[in-house]
Swiss-Prot record:
This is Ubiquinone/menaquinone biosynthesis C-methyltransferase UbiE. It comes from the Bacteria. Gene3D superfamilies: Vaccinia Virus protein VP39. The lineage of its organism: Bacteria, Pseudomonadati, Pseudomonadota, Alphaproteobacteria, Hyphomicrobiales. Belongs to the class I-like SAM-binding methyltransferase superfamily. MenG/UbiE family.
Length: 258
Protein backbone atom coordinates (compact mmCIF):
# COMPACT_ATOMS: atom_id res chain seq x y z
CA UNK A 1 0.00 0.00 0.00
CA UNK A 2 1.25 3.48 -0.88
CA UNK A 3 1.95 5.50 2.29
CA UNK A 4 3.09 9.11 2.22
CA UNK A 5 5.80 10.45 4.52
CA UNK A 6 7.74 13.70 4.69
CA UNK A 7 11.19 13.81 3.10
CA UNK A 8 14.21 15.45 4.69
CA UNK A 9 13.69 18.35 2.29
CA UNK A 10 10.18 18.88 3.63
CA UNK A 11 8.22 17.44 0.71
CA UNK A 12 6.07 14.33 0.69
CA UNK A 13 7.49 10.95 -0.23
CA UNK A 14 5.76 7.89 -1.60
CA UNK A 15 6.49 4.42 -2.96
CA UNK A 16 8.40 3.84 -6.17
CA UNK A 17 8.29 0.08 -6.19
CA UNK A 18 10.06 -0.92 -2.98
CA UNK A 19 11.92 2.41 -2.75
CA UNK A 20 10.87 5.60 -0.95
CA UNK A 21 11.14 8.69 -3.14
CA UNK A 22 9.69 12.19 -3.29
CA UNK A 23 6.39 12.58 -5.11
CA UNK A 24 7.95 14.64 -7.89
CA UNK A 25 10.79 12.17 -8.27
CA UNK A 26 8.34 9.28 -8.56
CA UNK A 27 6.50 10.99 -11.40
CA UNK A 28 9.77 11.52 -13.25
CA UNK A 29 10.87 7.92 -12.70
CA UNK A 30 7.51 6.52 -13.81
CA UNK A 31 7.61 8.69 -16.92
CA UNK A 32 11.01 7.26 -17.77
CA UNK A 33 9.68 3.71 -17.39
CA UNK A 34 6.87 4.32 -19.86
CA UNK A 35 9.05 6.21 -22.33
CA UNK A 36 11.14 3.03 -22.46
CA UNK A 37 8.24 0.60 -22.91
CA UNK A 38 5.81 2.69 -24.99
CA UNK A 39 6.41 0.84 -28.25
CA UNK A 40 6.21 -2.53 -26.50
CA UNK A 41 3.40 -1.78 -24.06
CA UNK A 42 1.22 -4.69 -25.18
CA UNK A 43 4.19 -7.00 -24.76
CA UNK A 44 4.72 -5.61 -21.26
CA UNK A 45 1.13 -6.36 -20.31
CA UNK A 46 1.38 -9.81 -21.88
CA UNK A 47 4.38 -10.53 -19.67
CA UNK A 48 2.72 -9.12 -16.55
CA UNK A 49 -0.51 -11.07 -17.05
CA UNK A 50 0.49 -14.08 -19.17
CA UNK A 51 -1.72 -12.59 -21.88
CA UNK A 52 -4.83 -12.43 -19.70
CA UNK A 53 -4.99 -8.62 -19.74
CA UNK A 54 -6.85 -8.77 -23.06
CA UNK A 55 -9.68 -10.77 -21.49
CA UNK A 56 -9.76 -8.52 -18.41
CA UNK A 57 -10.01 -5.40 -20.58
CA UNK A 58 -12.85 -6.93 -22.57
CA UNK A 59 -14.61 -7.69 -19.27
CA UNK A 60 -14.07 -4.10 -18.14
CA UNK A 61 -15.77 -2.69 -21.23
CA UNK A 62 -18.58 -5.23 -20.94
CA UNK A 63 -19.26 -4.12 -17.35
CA UNK A 64 -19.10 -0.47 -18.42
CA UNK A 65 -21.67 -1.23 -21.15
CA UNK A 66 -21.31 2.05 -23.07
CA UNK A 67 -24.60 3.19 -24.61
CA UNK A 68 -25.04 3.02 -28.36
CA UNK A 69 -26.09 6.64 -28.71
CA UNK A 70 -24.24 9.82 -29.71
CA UNK A 71 -23.02 12.31 -27.13
CA UNK A 72 -21.76 9.87 -24.48
CA UNK A 73 -18.26 10.83 -23.31
CA UNK A 74 -15.64 8.79 -21.49
CA UNK A 75 -12.29 9.88 -20.05
CA UNK A 76 -9.69 7.11 -20.18
CA UNK A 77 -6.82 8.04 -17.87
CA UNK A 78 -3.31 6.57 -18.21
CA UNK A 79 -4.65 5.17 -21.45
CA UNK A 80 -2.01 6.53 -23.82
CA UNK A 81 -1.94 3.67 -26.33
CA UNK A 82 -5.73 3.73 -26.68
CA UNK A 83 -6.28 0.10 -25.79
CA UNK A 84 -9.33 0.72 -23.57
CA UNK A 85 -10.63 3.70 -25.53
CA UNK A 86 -10.79 1.78 -28.80
CA UNK A 87 -12.65 -1.07 -27.13
CA UNK A 88 -15.19 1.38 -25.70
CA UNK A 89 -15.78 3.10 -29.05
CA UNK A 90 -16.23 -0.28 -30.74
CA UNK A 91 -18.65 -1.45 -28.03
CA UNK A 92 -20.74 1.71 -28.54
CA UNK A 93 -20.97 0.96 -32.27
CA UNK A 94 -18.93 4.07 -32.97
CA UNK A 95 -21.14 6.44 -30.98
CA UNK A 96 -18.98 7.13 -27.90
CA UNK A 97 -16.30 9.78 -27.79
CA UNK A 98 -13.19 8.87 -25.79
CA UNK A 99 -10.71 11.38 -24.41
CA UNK A 100 -7.45 9.57 -23.74
CA UNK A 101 -5.33 11.26 -21.09
CA UNK A 102 -1.78 10.32 -20.23
CA UNK A 103 1.15 12.13 -18.65
CA UNK A 104 3.54 10.38 -21.03
CA UNK A 105 3.90 11.78 -24.53
CA UNK A 106 5.51 8.62 -25.92
CA UNK A 107 2.48 6.54 -24.94
CA UNK A 108 0.12 9.11 -26.47
CA UNK A 109 2.10 9.06 -29.70
CA UNK A 110 1.50 5.33 -30.00
CA UNK A 111 -2.21 5.88 -29.33
CA UNK A 112 -2.61 8.62 -31.93
CA UNK A 113 -0.96 6.46 -34.58
CA UNK A 114 -3.23 3.55 -33.73
CA UNK A 115 -6.36 5.71 -33.80
CA UNK A 116 -5.47 6.93 -37.27
CA UNK A 117 -4.81 3.41 -38.55
CA UNK A 118 -8.10 2.17 -37.08
CA UNK A 119 -10.07 5.09 -38.51
CA UNK A 120 -11.04 6.24 -35.01
CA UNK A 121 -9.47 9.71 -34.98
CA UNK A 122 -12.94 11.27 -35.06
CA UNK A 123 -14.02 9.34 -31.97
CA UNK A 124 -10.92 10.04 -29.89
CA UNK A 125 -8.70 12.85 -28.73
CA UNK A 126 -5.44 12.59 -26.85
CA UNK A 127 -4.44 14.89 -23.99
CA UNK A 128 -1.08 15.03 -22.23
CA UNK A 129 -1.83 15.88 -18.60
CA UNK A 130 -1.57 14.72 -15.00
CA UNK A 131 -4.26 12.51 -13.42
CA UNK A 132 -3.90 14.61 -10.26
CA UNK A 133 -4.72 17.87 -12.11
CA UNK A 134 -7.26 17.08 -14.82
CA UNK A 135 -7.65 19.98 -17.30
CA UNK A 136 -11.43 19.64 -17.54
CA UNK A 137 -14.42 21.40 -16.02
CA UNK A 138 -16.53 19.79 -13.33
CA UNK A 139 -19.15 17.28 -14.51
CA UNK A 140 -17.72 16.85 -18.02
CA UNK A 141 -17.74 13.07 -18.55
CA UNK A 142 -20.25 10.24 -18.37
CA UNK A 143 -17.58 7.70 -17.41
CA UNK A 144 -13.97 7.58 -16.18
CA UNK A 145 -11.82 4.54 -16.85
CA UNK A 146 -8.27 3.69 -15.88
CA UNK A 147 -6.53 0.37 -16.52
CA UNK A 148 -3.19 -0.58 -14.94
CA UNK A 149 -2.40 3.07 -14.27
CA UNK A 150 -3.63 4.15 -10.85
CA UNK A 151 -0.78 2.44 -8.98
CA UNK A 152 1.72 4.65 -10.85
CA UNK A 153 0.13 7.88 -9.59
CA UNK A 154 2.06 9.48 -6.70
CA UNK A 155 -1.10 10.65 -4.88
CA UNK A 156 -3.84 8.13 -5.55
CA UNK A 157 -6.34 9.89 -3.29
CA UNK A 158 -5.95 13.11 -5.28
CA UNK A 159 -6.46 11.28 -8.57
CA UNK A 160 -9.63 9.66 -7.22
CA UNK A 161 -10.97 13.05 -6.10
CA UNK A 162 -10.27 14.44 -9.57
CA UNK A 163 -12.10 11.49 -11.12
CA UNK A 164 -15.13 12.28 -8.98
CA UNK A 165 -14.97 15.98 -9.86
CA UNK A 166 -14.98 15.58 -13.66
CA UNK A 167 -17.77 12.99 -13.72
CA UNK A 168 -21.35 14.06 -14.31
CA UNK A 169 -23.94 13.13 -11.66
CA UNK A 170 -24.80 9.52 -12.41
CA UNK A 171 -21.34 9.00 -13.91
CA UNK A 172 -19.41 5.74 -13.62
CA UNK A 173 -15.86 5.11 -12.38
CA UNK A 174 -14.09 1.90 -13.41
CA UNK A 175 -10.53 0.93 -12.49
CA UNK A 176 -8.79 -2.26 -13.61
CA UNK A 177 -5.59 -2.96 -11.69
CA UNK A 178 -3.27 -5.76 -10.70
CA UNK A 179 -4.22 -6.75 -7.18
CA UNK A 180 -3.73 -9.22 -4.33
CA UNK A 181 -3.95 -12.86 -5.35
CA UNK A 182 -6.45 -14.61 -3.07
CA UNK A 183 -5.63 -18.24 -3.88
CA UNK A 184 -2.63 -19.50 -1.81
CA UNK A 185 -1.03 -21.77 -4.42
CA UNK A 186 -1.61 -19.31 -7.24
CA UNK A 187 -0.20 -16.56 -5.02
CA UNK A 188 3.15 -18.32 -4.70
CA UNK A 189 3.32 -19.24 -8.38
CA UNK A 190 2.48 -15.71 -9.52
CA UNK A 191 4.99 -14.18 -7.10
CA UNK A 192 7.73 -16.44 -8.43
CA UNK A 193 6.80 -15.60 -12.02
CA UNK A 194 6.64 -11.87 -11.29
CA UNK A 195 9.89 -11.38 -9.40
CA UNK A 196 12.05 -13.99 -11.09
CA UNK A 197 10.85 -14.39 -14.66
CA UNK A 198 9.30 -11.10 -15.77
CA UNK A 199 12.36 -8.81 -15.32
CA UNK A 200 14.62 -11.37 -17.01
CA UNK A 201 12.26 -11.85 -19.95
CA UNK A 202 11.76 -8.10 -20.20
CA UNK A 203 15.51 -7.57 -20.39
CA UNK A 204 15.90 -10.34 -22.94
CA UNK A 205 13.15 -8.96 -25.19
CA UNK A 206 13.69 -5.21 -24.78
CA UNK A 207 17.28 -5.00 -23.54
CA UNK A 208 16.26 -3.39 -20.23
CA UNK A 209 14.85 -5.29 -17.27
CA UNK A 210 14.65 -2.34 -14.84
CA UNK A 211 11.22 -1.05 -15.96
CA UNK A 212 9.78 -4.53 -15.45
CA UNK A 213 11.30 -4.81 -11.97
CA UNK A 214 9.62 -1.53 -11.00
CA UNK A 215 6.25 -2.63 -12.40
CA UNK A 216 6.36 -5.90 -10.46
CA UNK A 217 7.30 -4.08 -7.25
CA UNK A 218 4.56 -1.48 -7.79
CA UNK A 219 1.96 -4.25 -7.83
CA UNK A 220 3.23 -5.61 -4.51
CA UNK A 221 2.97 -2.13 -2.93
CA UNK A 222 -0.54 -1.37 -4.20
CA UNK A 223 -3.47 -1.54 -1.72
CA UNK A 224 -5.41 -4.80 -1.71
CA UNK A 225 -8.96 -4.99 -3.05
CA UNK A 226 -10.73 -4.01 0.17
CA UNK A 227 -8.39 -1.13 0.99
CA UNK A 228 -8.56 0.32 -2.51
CA UNK A 229 -12.37 0.05 -2.49
CA UNK A 230 -12.33 2.04 0.76
CA UNK A 231 -10.22 4.74 -0.92
CA UNK A 232 -12.76 4.97 -3.75
CA UNK A 233 -15.56 5.38 -1.21
CA UNK A 234 -13.63 8.11 0.63
CA UNK A 235 -13.35 10.03 -2.65
CA UNK A 236 -17.14 10.33 -2.64
CA UNK A 237 -18.26 7.42 -4.80
CA UNK A 238 -21.33 5.32 -4.00
CA UNK A 239 -22.23 1.70 -4.80
CA UNK A 240 -18.53 0.79 -4.71
CA UNK A 241 -17.78 -2.82 -5.60
CA UNK A 242 -15.10 -4.94 -7.23
CA UNK A 243 -14.71 -8.16 -9.16
CA UNK A 244 -11.66 -10.39 -9.02
CA UNK A 245 -10.20 -11.92 -12.15
CA UNK A 246 -7.91 -14.94 -12.33
CA UNK A 247 -7.94 -15.50 -8.58
CA UNK A 248 -7.26 -11.86 -7.76
CA UNK A 249 -4.28 -11.31 -10.07
CA UNK A 250 -6.38 -8.40 -11.28
CA UNK A 251 -9.43 -6.67 -9.83
CA UNK A 252 -11.98 -4.43 -11.50
CA UNK A 253 -13.35 -1.68 -9.23
CA UNK A 254 -16.57 0.21 -9.85
CA UNK A 255 -18.12 3.29 -8.29
CA UNK A 256 -20.87 5.78 -9.12
CA UNK A 257 -21.19 9.53 -8.65
CA UNK A 258 -24.73 9.76 -7.29
Amino acid sequence: MSVERTTAAGGMETSYGFKRVGEGEKQSLVNDVFHKVANRYDLMNDLMSAGLHRLWKDAMVTWLNPPKRPGWKVLDVAGGTGDIAFRIVDASHGNAHATVLDINGSMLGVGRDRAQKKGLSGNTDFVEANAEELPFADATFDAYTIAFGIRNVPRIDVALSEAFRVLKPGGRFLCLEFSEVEMPLLDKAYEAWSFNAIPKIGKMVTGDGEPYSYLVESIAKFPNQQNFAAMISRAGFDRVSFRNYSGGIAALHSGWKL
